[in-house]
Amino acid sequence: MNWSLQLRSFILCWALLLLSPTGLAQYTATRDNCCILDERFGSYCPTTCGISDFLNSYQTDVDTDLQTLENILQRAENRTTEAKELIKAIQVYYNPDQPPKPGMIEGATQKSKKMVEEILKYEALLLTHESSIRYLQDIYTSNKQKITNLKQKVAQLEAQCQEPCKDSVRIHDTTGKDCQDIANKGAKESGLYFIRPLKATQQFLVYCEIDGSGNGWTVLQKRLDGSVDFKKNWIQYKEGFGHLSPTGTTEFWLGNEKIHLISMQSTIPYALRIQLKDWSGRTSTADYAMFRVGPESDKYRLTYAYFIGGDAGDAFDGYDFGDDPSDKFFTSHNGMHFSTWDNDNDKFEGNCAEQDGSGWWMNKCHAGHLNGVYYQGGTYSKSSTPNGYDNGIIWATWKTRWYSMKETTMKIIPFNRLSIGDGQQHHMGGSKQVSVEHEVDVEYP
């Protein structure tokens, strides 16, 4: 008989003893001790039935407590059984009277070490995988955000495509034969305008630089950031390349044919201004009188009357680099034909335009070269060029031939407007005349 059954039997016997006549016989009922009303017995004195009712009211709680005790005893019995089974298992594998087998402890120790090593290895592997998972999660989150941004951009573009096409570049309505003509007609804002020189068959777009004094400069060339490659062929230099912008903040070459049509159209000669900026932000200019570019039949020959002035110096007149006594003569530009890599018209036995990677009025080869290779930072060297020649954006009378300009501008204006509100004082009497050996006088129909 288990303990739960013994306990239940004990409690039942005790209850029967209370209910038996023997137990009740010891109780002598008197009025003093019996007829005292007690809510536990109802409205009756504690007769046998009253006590029975009283005990019955507690029977449910007693049964519950008994069941709880039985459950506890059952769990204890189960644990005891499990402990006995475990002891039996230990006794099977361990006999205190039997000495351990040779190497048993060492083998168990080695197995334990190996297990520990395996556990550590898997822990390290898990850490590595966790790190990789976090990295991939970061990439996923980043890509998800990028995809969201791209979807938004696509939605914006789709919405934009639903609208009628609009020209986002502002082109002014005023037209004329050059930018000064446009300024004379009342234009006061720099920007893009259409002009039609006298002998042009159709109008074309130019950038006009108009100042507060009413001067209208027609811009022929701009270098700003190296965004445009100036290594172009003859046709590209003829027609022009790059980008014209309303703010004048893009690189371009207007085109030799357009420059020819503008510069040759008027009885009033044009002045050419060259503006330079180095990588320290310093600026300088060089002005030339009676600037003209001939027709294609004459290889777009450059001519001018004389150097007016400017702190950049007269590089168009050549420069003595000290390499040869004839340096100055063979690096002058007045009267030179235009050359490109595929149309060589220079005085050099080789091809200046090809070795310098540009198009320009080459002699043998140059002292001023504004269409050269754009070198970030300005300074470059012979070893950094493909052929060992100075091929940067140079102006030898202001900087060395191994210093490439940061920004350049070539622009023209009618000569009689040059000194009006310009801020630069050029005196004709002090102007430097071109020497006889460089002077060129060419008539074009």
Swiss-Prot record:
Domain Fibrinogen C-terminal residue range list: 170-416
Cross-link entry Isoglutamyl lysine isopeptide (Gln-Lys) (interchain with K-432), positions: Q424
Region described as Disordered: 424-445
PROSITE patterns (UniProt xref): FIBRINOGEN_C_1, FIBRINOGEN_C_2
InterPro entries named among the record's database cross-references: FIB_ANG-like, Fibrinogen-like_C, Fibrinogen_a/b/g_C_1, Fibrinogen_a/b/g_C_dom, Fibrinogen_a/b/g_coil_dom, Fibrinogen_CS
Compartment(s) where it occurs, according to its Swiss-Prot or TrEMBL record: Secreted
Gamma-chain polymerization, binding amino end of another fibrin alpha chain, as annotated region: 400-422
Record-linked PANTHER family: FIBRINOGEN ALPHA CHAIN
Record comment regarding domains: A long coiled coil structure formed by 3 polypeptide chains connects the central nodule to the C-terminal domains (distal nodules). The long C-terminal ends of the alpha chains fold back, contributing a fourth strand to the coiled coil structure.
Function: Together with fibrinogen alpha (FGA) and fibrinogen beta (FGB), polymerizes to form an insoluble fibrin matrix. Has a major function in hemostasis as one of the primary components of blood clots. In addition, functions during the early stages of wound repair to stabilize the lesion and guide cell migration during re-epithelialization. Was originally thought to be essential for platelet aggregation, based on in vitro studies using anticoagulated blood. However, subsequent studies have shown that it is not absolutely required for thrombus formation in vivo.
Name by which UniProt lists this protein: Fibrinogen gamma chain
Protein encoded by which gene: Fgg
